[in-house]
Amino acid sequence: MAKQRGKLIVISGPSGAGKSTVVLKALEGRNDICFSVSATTRKPRPGEVDGKEYFFVDLDKFREMVENDEFLEHAEYVANSYGTPKAYVEKKLSEGMNVLLDIEVQGALQVHQKMPEAVMVFIIPPSMAELEKRMRSRGTDSERKIEARLIRAKEEYAAADFYDYIIINDDADKAAKEFSAIITAEYCKYDLRKNYLSEVD
């Protein structure tokens, strides 16, 4: 029997939603999920390994990849370019791995256009008040930055109807179980299992 193709799982949500915590809890004990590796023009930091943290490329190579449509999405951030290489994602999916892409809404919509079969998951806190509380509890952001992030969060919420699932992260353990359940449910869909029906007399 041919190896079942993996799923591309796109996760988005506002800063402070707890995406990283939820995902890391959900990944505990699983070996069927890997994070996507982005290409970047940023210089490697001490200890970073090419192909592990990022694929490090120069600007000319990055532009060539853009022109050749080699990215599922790409964007510029703090004077550096970042992109999700199609080839890496396709290789992992063909190996049966579920590929996790934690990305902001604009990039997620780019991915959805190129791979409509991607599983789109939006993680949010139980309320905007809770989101603001979490941002302030960090104690690292200025008032201006917090206000900007809250405005950005409202803009991201407006794009949530492009997503397949919404996880309300009021409890990280519960949210992680919901995330794992989503992956399980995706493999139980009719189109993936309809061949078994032909075996019924």
List the predicted regions and their residue ranges.
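Extreme N-terminal, non-catalytic leader segments
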Residues: 1-8, 31
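NTP-dependent small-molecule kinase module
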Residues: 2, 140-141, 155-201
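P-loop (Walker A) phosphate-binding loop of NTP-binding proteins
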Residues: 12-14
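Conserved lysine of the Walker
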Residues: 19
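Post-Walker A alpha-helix
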Residues: 22-23
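Post-Walker A helix-loop "phosphate-sensing" segment adjacent to the P-loop in P-loop NTPases
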Residues: 27-36
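ATP-dependent small-molecule kinase phosphotransfer cores
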Residues: 40-99, 106
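Conserved phosphate-donor/acceptor-positioning beta-strand/loop module used by diverse small-molecule
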Residues: 99-104, 113-137
